[in-house]
Amino acid sequence: MAFSAEDVLKEYDRRRRMEALLLSLYYPNDRKLLDYKEWSPPRVQVECPKAPVEWNNPPSEKGLIVGHFSGIKYKGEKAQASEVDVNKMCCWVSKFKDAMRRYQGIQTCKIPGKVLSDLDAKIKAYNLTVEGVEGFVRYSRVTKQHVAAFLKELRHSKQYENVNLIHYILTDKRVDIQHLEKDLVKDFKALVESAHRMRQGHMINVKYILYQLLKKHGHGPDGPDILTVKTGSKGVLYDDSFRKIYTDLGWKFTPL
């Protein structure tokens, strides 16, 4: 399409008037901005270094990953996996302390009179009582193994957790591990943290852990105690799981 000279002049005049209008909208110092039709940042060739294969974090920042370029510290996936929620840890420790009390027969629990009378009859039937005497001496030949076996025969399954307490009521014999409690709780916390780090948190069993830690501190539990957690394939699973956890902690493991 051809344009006449008059059309060209009109277009030129229109553009000049538009430019003058735009310039009037800016302060004098800002008019230079209109001189730039377009702008692009200069291209600089930057050679990006390769990220290190392993993060070299200071010992005080264990569990944190530092961004190679930004320097920002953040928790990595491994660190998150190893953390145990404070409330969950308190709950586990509370259950562990309950297990220690039951092991020593000092838990707050009332044994029904029927259970004790049934046990007395069963003990007599097996000639385990000392005749002619009363009190604790009467049951001095009764062991925890007897109590556990008789409870099973009598089908008092709700009392399996109270074997040590019942044995104490009958014989006045009690296990004392109060001198180990502080170390046991410390080791228990380490085990729970390692279990979560090893993705074995679902295998935490406070009774099993208690008996393993008692062995670690030279106080092996009795047979009836072990039987309450080591039954069939479940006990084997506990052994396999905690063998890995002990290896992670650098402890020597022996099955129950």
UniProtKB/Swiss-Prot annotation:
Q: Which GO terms describe its biological process?
A: regulation of viral transcription
Keywords annotated in UniProt: Activator, Transcription, Transcription regulation
Tell me which Pfam families the record gives.
Pox_VLTF3
**InterPro entries xref list:** Poxvirus_VLTF3
Protein's job: Transcription activation.
Query: What protein am I looking at?
Result: Putative transcription factor 001R
What species is this protein from?
Frog virus 3 (isolate Goorha) (FV-3)
